[in-house]
Amino acid sequence: MGTRAQARFVRVTPRKARRVVDLIRGLPAEEAQAVLRFAPQAASGPVGKVLASAIANAEHNDKLDRETLVVSRAWVDEGPTLKRIRPRGFGRAFRVNKRTSHITVEVAPRDTVGAASAKRKERTR
């Protein structure tokens, strides 16, 4: 089990945030930060903040070295949807859904991530 950080109610659609999270899953933490820094997607900002928070939590709370950390798990859940009205012609109104996300990133030391995935592979065989 690694160290987690979570950002809730982030005003980015879950579908777009998942595209960014898929880029960093399984990468070393330093490399994942570099990937996010140069990713053109708008969701890379909030995901980068969550990753930085997870790294800081691991360093401060668990006394882990940031060079050994790997993004072991990362996922995006759907938050509540803000419903807005857009006025249209002839007195009509269309609904605009402003979606929110809950972004979670978990980092763990490199040696524990490899052992856990090996155990999972043995169980599935």
Curated annotation (Swiss-Prot):
A Pfam family annotated for this UniProt entry: Ribosomal_L22
Family annotation (PROSITE patterns): RIBOSOMAL_L22
GO molecular function, one term: rRNA binding
GO CC terms: cytosolic large ribosomal subunit
InterPro entries: Ribosomal_uL22 (IPR001063), Ribosomal_uL22_bac/chlpt-type (IPR005727), Ribosomal_uL22_bac/org-type (IPR047867), Ribosomal_uL22_CS (IPR018260), Ribosomal_uL22_sf (IPR036394)
GO biological process: translation
Sorted UniProt keywords: Ribonucleoprotein, Ribosomal protein, RNA-binding, rRNA-binding
Disulfide bonds: none
Family according to the record: Belongs to the universal ribosomal protein uL22 family.
Described purpose of this protein according to its UniProt entry: This protein binds specifically to 23S rRNA; its binding is stimulated by other ribosomal proteins, e.g. L4, L17, and L20. It is important during the early stages of 50S assembly. It makes multiple contacts with different domains of the 23S rRNA in the assembled 50S subunit and ribosome.
Subunit field text: Part of the 50S ribosomal subunit.
Matches recorded under HAMAP family: Ribosomal_uL22_B
NCBIfam families, per the entry: rplV_bact (TIGR01044)
Protein name: Large ribosomal subunit protein uL22
Gene name of this polypeptide: rplV
